[in-house]
Amino acid sequence: MYDTGQEAPRCILVGRKTGREETSSLPELSLLVEELGYIPETILSFPLRTPERKFLFGPGQAEVVAREARMRGIELVVFDEDLTPAQQRNWEHLVKSRVMDRTEVIIEIFSRHARTKQAQLQTEKARLEYLLPRLRGAWSHLDRQRGGARGTRGEGERQIELDRRMILSRLARIRREMEAIERHQTTTRSRRLEAGIPRVSLVGYTNAGKSSLFTRLTGQAVRIQDRPFVTLDTTTRTCLIPGWGRVVVSDTVGFIQHLPHTLVDAFHATLEEVRDAHLLLEVVDLSSPNLLLHLSTTEEVLTEIGAHHIPRIRVYNKADRSSPHPLLPPSDHPEILVSAKTGEGIEGLLSLIVREMERHYPIETLELPYHRLGESHEVLSRAVIIHQEYTDVGLFVRYAPSVPSVHE
């Protein structure tokens, strides 16, 4: 949250009572609304066995929220659940203040952090698709003011139709621009595939320290802040892994619990970098009290985007913040504790990357006398050279044959 010198507006958070604090996403929602500049003054949670059509929650629970909002003079009510357009309108009429659901909060944060043309297009697409079914509530006050005779179209209805056409037209232009960017990215990825260079993608929950680890591995500084969703664009760099050779490392957008499907769809091109990886570094915030929830959410998102089968190393980051270290859950993947901030464990991580690459993409050797050096080009033109040495008798090379795509 930014300090503007003015008192931040206050809000109420409303969510589902889970019975287990570690599975509740309300604390995370509190951090998200703070990122938008609001102060969560009250958090209300209710059991939700059967969703109600009008308010999602029951009428008695709705009255509790409305009474709390009136008593405290609240400017915003935020729901940790997705609301239908009708439910959102009903709540706004009841509490007489702005109402947002979790999806809208996340889309708004994405919009504020989008820096590149692609990220701006992706977030605008998600925002417009979210807004489209909610146009009715935006102009209904015009029809109420004018009354409107039966069988005639009111001013509000005409405005809705005009807005709908404008949004659909804008969405069509956005899709065309995104397709042009994606074609260029596909060409770039194809060239890397042809070069046979292995690709390593950093994935994990938002604010786990992926960008800090990316900087530590590649030596290339990227935008790093202790805030959610600072990274929305995929940043890719080639780096040299001792004992292996060149790899392409990618820093990707962070995951979050209940990641809106509109954003998964809008960012599908960005997430292609994850699906095309040969090895994933699953970065986990070791100091987070919600570590287990972050692990399960990451697994869900990787499954949703079709990347759960890719070889993976679980990297518990921020080891410098966690003492003593918590008891870690069992894992099917190799794991290591590191601190991207201090460098602790990074050498061990590099060794683990080499071990996993060799396990999945075996190393071969080539020995050629000097009079046959011309034959090396055919073998090594698409290989990953790990070690090359000219000896007294000829050329000695350790290499990985052209690393196949994970989809091959």
Swiss-Prot record:
One of the Pfam families matching this protein, by short name: MMR_HSR1
Binding site for GTP: 204-211, 229-233, 251-254, 317-320, 339-341
PANTHER family: GTP-BINDING PROTEIN 6-RELATED (PTHR10229:SF0), GTP-BINDING PROTEIN HFLX (PTHR10229)
Residues that, per the record, bind Mg(2+): 211, 231
PROSITE patterns named in the record: G_HFLX
Similarity remark: Belongs to the TRAFAC class OBG-HflX-like GTPase superfamily. HflX GTPase family.
Subunit structure as annotated in this protein's UniProt entry: Monomer. Associates with the 50S ribosomal subunit.
Superkingdom, taxonomy of origin: Bacteria
Molecular function GO labels: GTP binding; GTPase activity; metal ion binding; ribosome binding
Cofactors demanded by this protein: Mg(2+)
Keyword Cell division: no
InterPro entries associated with the record: G_HFLX_dom, GTP-bd, GTP-bd_M, GTPase_HflX, GTPase_HflX_N, GTPase_HflX_N_sf, P-loop_NTPase
Swiss-Prot/TrEMBL keywords: Cytoplasm, GTP-binding, Magnesium, Metal-binding, Nucleotide-binding
Name of the protein described by the UniProt record: GTPase HflX
GO CC aspect terms: cytoplasm
Subcellular localization, as worded in the UniProt entry: Cytoplasm
Hflx-type G domain mapped to chain residues: 198-361
Function of the protein: GTPase that associates with the 50S ribosomal subunit and may have a role during protein synthesis or ribosome biogenesis.
